[in-house]
UniProtKB/Swiss-Prot annotation:
The lineage of its organism: Eukaryota, Fungi, Dikarya, Ascomycota, Saccharomycotina. Keywords: Membrane, Transmembrane, Transmembrane helix. Pfam families: B12D. It is a single-pass membrane protein. One of its GO terms (biological process) is negative regulation of protein-containing complex assembly. The chain crosses the membrane at residues 25-47. It is found in: Membrane. It comes from Debaryomyces hansenii (strain ATCC 36239 / CBS 767 / BCRC 21394 / JCM 1990 / NBRC 0083 / IGC 2968) (Yeast). Belongs to the UPF0495 family. Its main location: membrane. This is UPF0495 protein DEHA2C16280g. One of its GO terms (cellular component) is membrane. It comes from the Eukaryota.
């Protein structure tokens, strides 16, 4: 008796590692090291860079000054308009 192709193929595909060539193992190791070092150095840059202001030293940013200047400018403009209306 001869086995059908379906039975032969199912017997061959029982293990996923059997389909993976041994030459690929160094590639996987190198890619793992590259991804791990990329994550490490990115974290180190974000966490310890003194010139990068993400969370720390937020008061050094000029954003509050710019936003407050716009608010003060609008308030001053509204006061001038009210004074002109009162003069009429």
């Amino acid at each position: 008796m001869r086995a059908t192709r379906v039975l032969l193929n199912s017997a061959k595909k029982s293990s996923i590692a059997a389909n993976l060539p041994i030459e690929m193992y160094p590639l996987f190791a190198a890619m793992g090291v590259a991804v791990a070092s990329g994550c490490f150095f990115t974290y180190r840059h974000f966490a310890h860079d003194k010139e990068l202001r993400l969370w720390k030293n937020a008061n050094l940013s000029n954003l509050d000054n710019v936003l407050n200047a716009e608010v003060h400018k609008n308030e001053a403009g509204n006061k001038d308009e009210k004074k002109e209306e009162n003069k009429d």
